[in-house]
């Protein structure tokens, strides 16, 4: 099940720098990662990607601990419909749920997961509305939650997301790395890029990074 309408364009480097400037004016520490530094010797001008990390940026809009506790107490989807096997299976890599402007009970047989109305949760609603004050680019966004219930065992492999162009993420709970690895013509290039994320951090990807 896909929620919302995919954006025509993702974020660009100018927008990321503008967001960085807005947060830094409010005394938040930011770091803009140039993911293409790892392949600069290959002269791949069209392969420029960036990700902006705002340390503890959630704090500007809402209390990270309250959000973590709220999320921790929700009912998460632990099952999904496997398209290849055509049956409902248990989730092993992570649990999921979504937030939108309506509620939905899961119906795994019909490929539908749990959706909560974000306005029912004050701490999340404040975060969502707070981001909107930074520009129209943050309007009409859908929200997906990924619960890595055991960070020593959980996780997903390297992938790109064709299903979305705008990516704004928040980290809650234990620190966890976000890793990138460049691929070109089906081959892995150079070194892994590791971006550390801590409780309360916000990260924003440009379109290529997503």
Regions found by a protein language model. Name each.
Residues 1-210:
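Non-heme Fe(II) oxygenase metal-center motifs and adjacent flexible, charged/small-residue loops
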């Amino acid at each position: 099940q896909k929620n919302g309408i995919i954006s025509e364009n993702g974020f660009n480097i100018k927008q990321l720098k503008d967001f960085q400037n807005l947060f830094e004016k409010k005394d938040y520490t930011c770091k803009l990662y140039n993911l293409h530094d790892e392949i600069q010797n290959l002269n791949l001008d069209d392969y420029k990607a960036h990700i902006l990390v705002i340390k503890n940026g959630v704090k500007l809009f809402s209390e990270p601990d309250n959000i973590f506790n709220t999320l921790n107490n929700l009912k998460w989807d632990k099952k999904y419909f496997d398209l290849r096997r055509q049956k409902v299976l248990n989730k092993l890599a992570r649990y999921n749920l979504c937030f939108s402007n309506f509620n939905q009970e899961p119906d795994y047989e019909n490929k539908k997961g749990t959706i909560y109305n974000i306005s029912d949760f004050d701490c999340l609603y404040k975060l969502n509305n707070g981001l909107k004050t930074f520009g129209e680019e943050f309007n009409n966004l859908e929200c997906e939650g990924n619960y890595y219930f055991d960070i020593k065992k959980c996780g997903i492999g390297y992938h790109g997301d064709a299903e979305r162009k705008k990516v704004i993420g928040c980290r809650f709970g234990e620190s966890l790395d976000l890793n990138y690895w460049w691929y070109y013509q089906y081959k892995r290039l150079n070194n892994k890029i590791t971006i550390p994320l801590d409780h309360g951090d916000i990260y924003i990807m440009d379109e290529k990074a997503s």
